[in-house]
Curated annotation (Swiss-Prot):
Belongs to the radical SAM superfamily. MoaA family. Its cofactor is [4Fe-4S] cluster. It catalyses: GTP + AH2 + S-adenosyl-L-methionine = (8S)-3',8-cyclo-7,8-dihydroguanosine 5'-triphosphate + 5'-deoxyadenosine + L-methionine + A + H(+). [4Fe-4S] cluster 2 binds at residues 257, 260, 274. Catalyzes the cyclization of GTP to (8S)-3',8-cyclo-7,8-dihydroguanosine 5'-triphosphate. This is GTP 3',8-cyclase. S-adenosyl-L-methionine binds at residues 30, 72, 123, 194. Its EC number is 4.1.99.22. Pathway: Cofactor biosynthesis; molybdopterin biosynthesis. The keyword Lyase applies. It is an enzyme of class 4 (lyase). GO terms for molecular function: 4 iron, 4 sulfur cluster binding; cyclic pyranopterin monophosphate synthase activity; GTP 3',8'-cyclase activity; GTP binding; metal ion binding; S-adenosyl-L-methionine binding.
Length: 329
């Protein structure tokens, strides 16, 4: 289906990132260094399964092909499997993925797959157990690794692993990561550290451009792959000697926003046109009843006309994003 979601700059939107909670049990230094602190929203305040069903139905009708469930940590919701199944009801949505810290993968991943999940991203910022503990605040490295193995055993042909690239923390560990994916079908995605409202000091201390890694990969014979229309923002590289792939997400690179194809809905039902945009468009009053779908689609389409051509990270403008758990990264 051709996307009906097209902005003023002729960008088409096939990809919805849907946050279902902002609660997380990890304390990652770049996201929630002081742990989760409720912002006045209780668990009962997050989108219900029926509301999720309605919002994804509207996006599917407008041409969305891929939905990624994010948080916080999505698997903390007891109804997470039901949420996957609700999204799966839309035939137009070909891919349903989750971004997770992985701590419940080993126990639940087979059930998620049975419910309709087609893709998994796991956050792993270090392959050293002690450093993993230091970054996340949780001594769960072996549990997360077992979860990745369980995902393959459950039938997932590929697992994506997200690694936030940080100077003097993990930027020098490329060889360790490459050895890990040599015989595993893992797409390892290095994500440039992004400045948020609460993370300016960390950003100044640890930001390093992904271009350093890209130059090194090209020097070693890695080959840049073409993007598909519902892919995320990663530049993906492959190598004939490796079962895995490398992805680079570099939001500070020139023209990063030119290929934007994704919209975001927060866990309380606000449409965000950009991860680092201002404010959000409330959709929740149109998620109460199935009869509101036409009005919901109209509001989404109208909001998209206001999407700006680019973010303003280069000007140190992080918008309303105080931390990445709020809107799901």
């Amino acid at each position: 289906m051709a996307s009906q979601l097209t902005d003023a700059f002729a960008r088409k939107y096939y990809y919805l990132r849907l946050s279902i909670t902002d609660v997380c049990n990890f304390r990652c230094t770049y996201c929630l260094p002081d742990g989760y602190k409720p912002s006045g929203v209780t668990n009962k305040g997050f989108l219900t399964v029926d509301e999720i069903r309605r919002v994804t139905r509207a996006f599917a009708s407008l041409g969305t092909e891929k939905v990624r469930l994010t948080g916080g940590e999505p698997s903390l919701r007891r109804d997470f499997t039901d949420i996957i199944a609700a999204v799966r009801e839309n035939d137009a949505i070909r891919q349903i993925a989750v971004t997770t810290n992985g701590y419940r993968l080993e126990r639940d991943v087979a059930n998620w797959r049975d419910a309709g999940l087609t893709g998994i991203n796991v956050s792993v910022d270090s392959l050293d157990a002690r450093q993993f503990h230091a970054i996340t605040g949780q001594d769960k490295f072996n549990q997360v690794m077992a979860g990745i193995d369980a995902a393959f055993e459950a039938g997932f042909e590929k697992v994506k692993v997200n690694t936030v690239l940080m100077r003097d923390v993990n930027h020098h560990q490329l060889d360790t990561f490459l050895n890990w994916i040599q015989h595993r079908p893992i797409q390892l995605r290095f994500i440039e550290l992004m400045e948020t409202g609460e993370g300016s000091e960390l950003f100044r201390k640890h930001h390093i451009s992904g271009q350093v890694l890209r130059d090194e990969l090209l020097r070693r014979g890695w080959i840049h792959q073409l993007r598909q229309r519902s892919d995320g923002p990663a530049q993906v590289f492959c190598h004939p000697d490796y079962a895995g792939e490398i992805g680079l997400i570099m939001p500070y690179e020139k023209d990063f926003c030119a290929t934007c194809n994704r919209l975001r809905v927060s866990s309380i039902g606000k449409l965000h046109l950009c991860l680092f945009g201002e404010g959000g468009v409330n959709l929740r009053d149109l998620l109460e009843d199935d009869t509101q779908q036409q009005a919901l689609e109209a509001r989404i389409s109208a909001a998209l006309r206001e999407k700006k051509q680019t973010h303003f990270l280069h000007q140190n403008n992080t918008g309303i994003t105080q931390n990445l758990s709020y809107i799901g990264g």
